[in-house]
């Protein structure tokens, strides 16, 4: 028996499976004394202790609502019969850290978040958790922590930002999101947009609190939280400023106490079938390629075997239905207007494309939740009908071939044609490609190869939104293929292949590409090949040494020593 002795009755789970060691008996007197100082009374020591963890900060709009939502979650915990204990963790804003050295720290923050939540929960022997997050890496970081700890846990998303509205100097008006600013930078640099219009877009893109508005990484991961069963049904889509989120916060607090009473933990919910549901929903929405990386990492924490092959296997059966930015016309608030994530889940379930028997944080199955909500049908515009999809298969494809023996990830929704063959233009890290584009040295038909940006070689597997936005802004979005051992933003558009594995620093084929080589990708065949004679390629390996480490101390140096391949989720350990 562990040191945290449980006292459950024969048929009833203990609602304090861990905290008794700090609340019960004479040896807990020092801990009880500290608890009294933070407001606990005699009656509270019999209640389960619930951690309310959030990545709240004032650096970015993504997280601004989280302190308010944490208060709501605490109210719900009290109402449910528990005692809430609020604590915080970090968050990195990709929108601010994009395109410079700061982006090295983005994916690293996912691990720091998971580790920090685990550290507090384990050190203080807290019984369960409500985990709140708003930015791209904080969502998977929280879900990784939940899976690793395997306690009663509910995840709650901060919510999406409302779209901005801009009137340009030619009199045209349109909705805009953060991604429009990155593309406007490229257009302005190429002389295709005035500085005045760039300024107008800058001032319009973020009208208030919330995460980036399209089906980018944060909204994709919020949909995944709901599809996995780790978030309350219907909680992913309402915008951050909508006070329905406060009610979801209160209900999340009540729900975690109910999970303790039922004896349900995170791994009871995050099963292989649940991950298959999450992949299916991601494919149907046309979600971010970052979902591949994050789902692999979350599954590993849940001790569920998930591989890149699962994404193609499921994607083959799931049509792409969401006409959502970055490739489509609509944003997350539009999804909310037509009923939210339950709409697409109900359609997939009715078509036999989801597992309805998966348990969720309500204590009920996915099918039971959807029957209770009874969401409307797909609207046919924002979310297309199953028999009239945007693409017949999912929006993300895993490629293999001589260019990526361990795999690469492509948002196939961005390709108008299945086949692209072009000439390599090779750059060591992102800045070289940006400089070449600014100087007019990237042309139609080029394959821009950016290497030494992988999990270990970067380190941190930076997102390439600055260069992809600039390529699109320069009018080359459909004519230039970009491939990298780094990542792409959920807002990236164009012809982009990322997560190329093995990465350059590990001696993957990407390390040996030279200017002028021909590279061919065939989306339908899922092939991705370097068209160089094998003997020539082997000769290039003679005497090869990777670029020296860019960081030799601090968190990035530690990360580079611990991180694994993107093909397995870029997990540490």
Swiss-Prot record:
Cofactor: [2Fe-2S] cluster; Mg(2+)
Signal peptide as annotated in the record: none
Name of the protein this chain belongs to: Dihydroxy-acid dehydratase
Residue sites binding [2Fe-2S] cluster per the record: 62, 135, 212
Similarity-based family: Belongs to the IlvD/Edd family.
Oligomeric form and interacting partners: Homodimer.
EC number: 4.2.1.9
GO molecular function: 2 iron, 2 sulfur cluster binding; dihydroxy-acid dehydratase activity; magnesium ion binding
Listed HAMAP family: IlvD
Binding site residues for Mg(2+): 94, 136-137, 463
EC primary class: lyase
Pfam families to which the protein is assigned, alphabetical: ILV_EDD_C (PF24877), ILVD_EDD_N (PF00920)
Pathway: Amino-acid biosynthesis; L-isoleucine biosynthesis; L-isoleucine from 2-oxobutanoate: step 3/4; Amino-acid biosynthesis; L-valine biosynthesis; L-valine from pyruvate: step 3/4
UniProt xrefs under PANTHER family: DIHYDROXY-ACID DEHYDRATASE DAD, DIHYDROXY-ACID DEHYDRATASE, MITOCHONDRIAL
Gene name tied to this protein: ilvD
InterPro entries: DHAD_IlvD/Edd, Dihydro-acid_dehy_C, DihydroxyA_deHydtase, DiOHA_6PGluconate_deHydtase_CS, ILV_EDD_C, ILV_EDD_N, IlvD/EDD_N
């Amino acid at each position: 028996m562990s040191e945290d002795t449980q006292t459950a009755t024969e048929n009833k789970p203990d609602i304090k499976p861990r905290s008794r060691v700090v609340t019960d008996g004479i040896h807990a007197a020092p801990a009880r004394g500290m608890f009294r100082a933070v407001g606990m009374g005699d009656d509270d020591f019999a209640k389960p202790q619930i951690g309310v963890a959030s990545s709240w900060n004032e650096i970015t709009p993504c997280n601004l609502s989280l302190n308010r939502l944490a208060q709501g979650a605490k109210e719900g915990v009290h109402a449910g019969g528990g005692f809430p204990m609020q604590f915080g963790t970090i968050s990195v804003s990709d929108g601010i850290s994009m395109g410079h050295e700061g982006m090295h720290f983005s994916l690293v923050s996912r691990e720091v978040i998971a580790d920090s939540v685990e550290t507090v929960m384990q050190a203080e022997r807290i019984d369960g958790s409500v985990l709140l997050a708003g930015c791209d890496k904080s969502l998977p970081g929280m879900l990784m922590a939940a899976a690793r700890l395997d306690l009663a846990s509910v995840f709650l998303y901060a919510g999406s930002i409302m779209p901005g509205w801009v009137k340009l100097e030619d009199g045209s008006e349109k909705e805009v999101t953060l991604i429009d600013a990155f593309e406007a930078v490229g257009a302005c640099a190429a002389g295709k947009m005035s500085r005045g219009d760039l300024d107008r877009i800058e001032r319009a893109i973020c009208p208030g609190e919330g995460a980036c508005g399209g089906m980018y990484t944060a909204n994709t991961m919020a949909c995944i939280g709901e599809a996995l069963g780790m978030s309350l049904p219907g909680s992913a889509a309402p915008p951050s400023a909508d006070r329905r989120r406060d009610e979801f916060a209160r209900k999340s607090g009540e729900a975690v106490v109910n999970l303790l009473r039922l004896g349900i933990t995170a791994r009871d919910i995050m099963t292989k079938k649940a991950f298959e549901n999450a992949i299916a929903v991601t494919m149907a929405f046309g979600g971010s390629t970052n979902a591949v990386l994050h789902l692999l990492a979350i599954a590993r924490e849940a001790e569920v075997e998930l591989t890149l092959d699962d994404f193609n296997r499921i994607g083959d059966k799931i049509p792409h239905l969401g006409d959502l930015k970055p490739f489509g016309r609509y944003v997350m608030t539009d999804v909310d207007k037509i009923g939210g994530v339950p709409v697409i889940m109900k359609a997939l379930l009715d078509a036999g494309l989801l597992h309805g028997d998966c348990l969720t944080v309500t204590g009920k199955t996915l099918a039971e939740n959807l029957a209770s909500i009874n969401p409307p049908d797909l609207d046919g515009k924002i979310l297309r009908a199953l028999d009239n999809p945007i693409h017949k298969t999912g929006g993300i494809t895993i490629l293999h071939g001589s260019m990526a023996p361990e795999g690469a990830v492509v948002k196939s929704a961005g390709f108008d044609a299945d086949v692209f063959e072009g000439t390599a233009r090779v750059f060591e890290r992102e800045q070289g490609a940006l400089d070449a584009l600014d100087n007019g040295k990237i042309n139609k038909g080029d394959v821009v190869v950016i290497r030494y940006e992988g999990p270990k070689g970067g380190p941190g597997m930076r997102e390439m939104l600055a260069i992809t936005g600039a390529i699109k802004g320069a009018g080359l979005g459909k004519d230039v293929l970009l491939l990298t051992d780094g990542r792409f933003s959920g807002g990236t558009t164009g012809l982009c292949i990322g997560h190329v594995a093995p990465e350059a620093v590990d001696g993957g084929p990407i390390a040996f590409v030279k200017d002028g080589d021909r590279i061919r990708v065939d989306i339908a065949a899922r092939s991705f090949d370097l068209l160089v004679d094998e003997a020539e390629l082997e000769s290039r390996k003679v005497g090869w040494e990777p670029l020296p480490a860019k960081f030799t101390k601090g968190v990035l140096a530690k990360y580079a020593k611990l991180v694994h391949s993107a093909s397995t989720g870029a997990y540490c350990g």
